[in-house]
Structure formats: C-alpha cells, structure tokens
Amino acid sequence: MAGHSKWAQIKRQKAKNDVAKGAMFARLSREIIVATRLGGPDPAGNFRLRLAIEQAKAASLPGENIQRAIDKGSGAIEGDNFEEIRYEGYGPAGVAILIEAQTDNRNRTVADLRAVFSRNGGNLGETGCVGWMFQQRGVAVLEGPVREEELIEAALDGGALGYEIDPQGQGVEVTCEAADLEALTDALKGAGFRLAAAEVRWVPDNNIELADPDVARQVLTLLEKLESLDDVQRVSANHLVEDAVLESIYA
C-alpha cells in the first residue's frame, strides 16, 4: 500500500514510546504478569510469556524487573491482580476503535477512557459495537531489507495469510491466524529472518481513509491520548491516512 501512512505511523509510535520509557516499562511488566498468570512461569511452555520477555529485553527492561513480574504473576510474591478487558468506541469520522486494557480497577479505567473520548470528539461504546469490524491476527514484524522469494517460502511454511513490505525496504509485516503465530515466528527465525516484534493484534476488515488534515489530526490525537493512559496496553483503529496528510500534520 505504497503512499499510505502505515509505516510512517509505526515509526512515529516507536519514537513516542522511546520518550515514554517509564510508561512502556510498566506496560511490559503488566504483560509479563498477565502472561505468567494465564500460562505459567516457564517461557519454554508459555509462548505469550516468551514473547513478552523478548519484547521486554529488546526495550532494555532490567532483568530483575522481568523476574519480579514473573514472580508476581506466579504468586511467588504479592502483586496487583490485573485482568484483561477490551473496550470499544468511536472516534471522529466514525473511526472504530478497540482498546485492550490490563487493569486492577475497572471503574478507574472506564472513567479515564470515557473522559479521553469525550474530550476528543469520540464516544466510548458498548461491548460489541465495533468488535465485529475487526479480526484477531498474529503479526510478525521483520527487520529489512529481505529477499521476497525467501520470505514467501518461509511465510508459507509458517502458515502465513499474507505480508506487507515497507515501501522503503525498512521492514515487513507478516500476518497469520492468531493461533499460528508461534509456528510462524519459528519458521521465520529458522529461515534466518530477524524478528523485530511479534504480537496478536486486532486488524480491521476495512479502513476509513482520512483525507482532511483537521479530521486526521483529531483522530490521531484521540488515539495518542488513549495510548497514553496507564491501563491501556494497545489501541487498534480502522483509520488510514495518506503520507502527505500525515506529513502536513507532523511537519
């Protein structure tokens, strides 16, 4: 999809995460706690935990913090009782938004989300109001450049549904069924590809293109403010912005 802002927005998100390192560390720790609680403390038999640890190490989360999060998740030491909750809503121009949260206080999380939506031209909706517009997919992000022929062979071996290459050759996203993510990452690593990230993500069936810079700015501001909330792990939306529009916003 050359000419669109997908990769530019990924790079902007990485830069924003670097600035908010403290918040990122907290999110990584929560994910390790929840992954341990759901699948046990042994990463060899808990793929989600293994991914969480790899992401934490890549972000330079100290080893003692990683172990402490595992201990909290396993009950070896006392910790907060986080639960995973999905929230749904609408942004400006009818953009559908899914929020994945990990919280120890539902009332606080809902109040924070509702405040951000209402202040930025959106509405927090009921469960199911936009979820039907998305599908859960496994996504493996590879460092570029890559040889496309080799990528296709490894991706097919791992059960991939498709792939998308950064127009500038700086990365590749390979998608699969959520349940096939472990097999896909194993196949890609086995073929010698460098894995930058892997996660299960909500992917929209269709996108709303935002050609008006003012509307696009309002939507992006809403998404950024949602992402900045302490309890929010990930935000997915069905918006699409041309590179030229994005550049005019962040120039």
Swiss-Prot record:
GO terms for biological process: regulation of DNA-templated transcription. Its main location: cytoplasm. The keyword DNA-binding applies. Belongs to the TACO1 family. One of its GO terms (molecular function) is DNA binding. It is found in: Cytoplasm. GO terms for cellular component: cytosol. InterPro entries: Integrase-like_N, TACO1_YebC-like_2nd/3rd_dom, TACO1_YebC_N, Transcrip_reg_TACO1-like, Transcrip_reg_TACO1-like_dom3, YebC-like. Pfam families: TACO1_YebC_N, Transcrip_reg. This is Probable transcriptional regulatory protein glr2507. Keywords: Cytoplasm, DNA-binding, Transcription, Transcription regulation. The keyword Cytoplasm applies.
